[in-house]
């Protein structure tokens, strides 16, 4: 598989996960979630600042919204001279939001989320509010509390409260999935996962994700994130070995998980598995990426006609996707093989 195509596919995941059609009926909003302010005196809990923001972002992705990724947010905050987790007054938050709207490139957010947390004698209180940047209007604070050991349930309840306040549609089945995934993962494994996904060093991130999988065997999101890191380095066999450890499809990356499996299978020269995984991804969410990967798999299996059909479906889904021309050239090479002198 060509390296350029693999890099294009992996880069596309930074924009957020693909979602079931039922979850994306309404136009998606774009959110910038700032690291939560740590109002507790225990600095060992600083990991929660970025961890809670990332986790809330995963929930919003699962609710069909767009979320600025951690790396882009870090660059934005550093450029604005704002330390991660620093408290922001409403006026400062609105000014930051205006900057994102004025940028020539990148995600232009229309919602800003401020958050804070406090831990006292084993109890945690978490609060967040949404600011509508275009209307310059702040919604009321939403807060939830509970035992620190039940952090994920508290965070899930906060996410659902924000969704209701924002009038985002969350199906009963989606809510049940949130409940199951938040109750199953031990707090220690969740902490390790948060430290991994909010880190900047890829080697350290991979080590932490492997550790999270040891602390909670089958941890779906840890397996997915580790697999994505390995795939970026084209370590296909290792990526396949870690992806198969996921005990279930990882929320909110269900479709992307199967797309990643398809990409890895192509890297391992296994078009049959790639075809199966791409079709699974498309059964969850129709996307240009899904049709392009399926087209790649069918091309590798020697079915040019079916690959061309998938190329047309990809164009219909998103004609601007940069991978379309890459696949078109590959199919043209098959039709008109270059002659060597």
Stretches with model-predicted labels:
Residues 222, 255-257, 290, 323-324:
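TPR alpha-solenoid repeat register
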Residues 24-100, 106, 110-124, 137-141, ...:
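Short beta-strand->alpha-helix linker/helix-N-cap micro-motif
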Residues 217, 251-253, 285-286, 319:
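Short coil turns that delineate tetratricopeptide repeat
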């Amino acid at each position: 598989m060509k390296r350029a195509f693999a890099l294009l596919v992996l880069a596309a995941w930074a924009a957020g996960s693909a979602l079931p059609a039922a979850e994306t009926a309404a136009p998606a909003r774009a959110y910038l979630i700032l690291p939560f302010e740590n109002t507790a005196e225990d600095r060992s809990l600083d990991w929660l600042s970025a961890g809670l923001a990332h986790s809330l972002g995963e929930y919003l992705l699962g609710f069909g919204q767009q979320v600025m990724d951690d790396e882009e947010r870090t660059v934005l905050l550093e450029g604005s001279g704002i330390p991660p987790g620093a408290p922001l007054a409403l006026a400062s938050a609105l000014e930051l939001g205006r900057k994102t709207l004025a940028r020539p490139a990148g995600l232009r957010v229309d919602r800003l989320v401020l958050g804070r947390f406090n831990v006292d004698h084993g109890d945690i209180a978490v609060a967040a509010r949404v600011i509508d940047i275009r209307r310059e209007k702040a919604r009321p604070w939403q807060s939830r509390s509970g035992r620190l050991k039940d952090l994920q349930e508290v965070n899930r309840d906060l996410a659902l409260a924000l969704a209701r306040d924002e009038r985002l549609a969350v199906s009963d089945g989606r809510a049940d999935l949130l409940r199951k995934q938040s109750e199953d993962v031990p707090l220690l494994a969740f902490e390790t996962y948060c430290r991994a996904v909010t880190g900047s060093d890829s080697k350290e991130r991979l080590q932490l994700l492997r550790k999270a999988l040891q602390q909670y065997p089958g941890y779906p999101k840890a397996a997915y994130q580790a697999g994505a890191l390995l795939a970026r380095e084209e370590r296909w066999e290792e990526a396949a070995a870690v992806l198969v450890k996921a005990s279930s499809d990882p929320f909110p990356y269900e479709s992307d998980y199967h797309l990643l499996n398809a990409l890895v299978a192509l890297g391992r020269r296994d078009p049959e598995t790639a075809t199966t995984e791409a079709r699974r991804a498309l059964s969850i969410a129709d996307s240009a990426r899904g049709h392009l990967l399926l087209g790649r798999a069918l091309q590798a299996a020697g079915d040019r006609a079916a690959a061309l059909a998938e190329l047309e479906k990809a164009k219909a889904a998103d004609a601007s996707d940069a991978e379309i021309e890459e696949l078109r050239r590959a199919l043209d090479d098959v039709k008109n093989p270059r002659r060597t002198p």
